[in-house]
Amino acid sequence: MTCYVNKIRTYKNFPIKGINYLDLNGIYLDNSSRDHLVEDCIQKIHPFLESFDYFGLIEARGFLVGSILADRLNKGIVQLRNKLGRLPDETKKVDHELEYGKAQLEVQTGSGSVL
């Protein structure tokens, strides 16, 4: 884990005062760091592989690493959008809390068992 932690930059008081934004771009730019992050995630997820069919990827940060995980673990992807109204067909909305407020995620119905 330590090989990529030093690639994370922290921006204090962003996007609002009292919140520290963790910028993962340093990990994304370095292939070795990105690979170590993905391998660490796989180790943590491995005991649960049989309990879900899809990775639920929250835009936009979740799309990057989640796509790699889904590919390596032979799982599908379900998009969880935080900008409502961007998915066609029937959807469900789920309330959730952020560090600085409340929000909703939207997912298409019939998406199966999602982690």
Residue ranges and their predicted role:
Residues K7, G62-F63:
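Generic non-transmembrane alpha-helix signal with a bias for helix starts/N-cap capping motifs
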Residues K75-L115:
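Short, glycine/charge-rich flexible loops or terminal/linker lids adjacent to PRPP-binding catalytic cores
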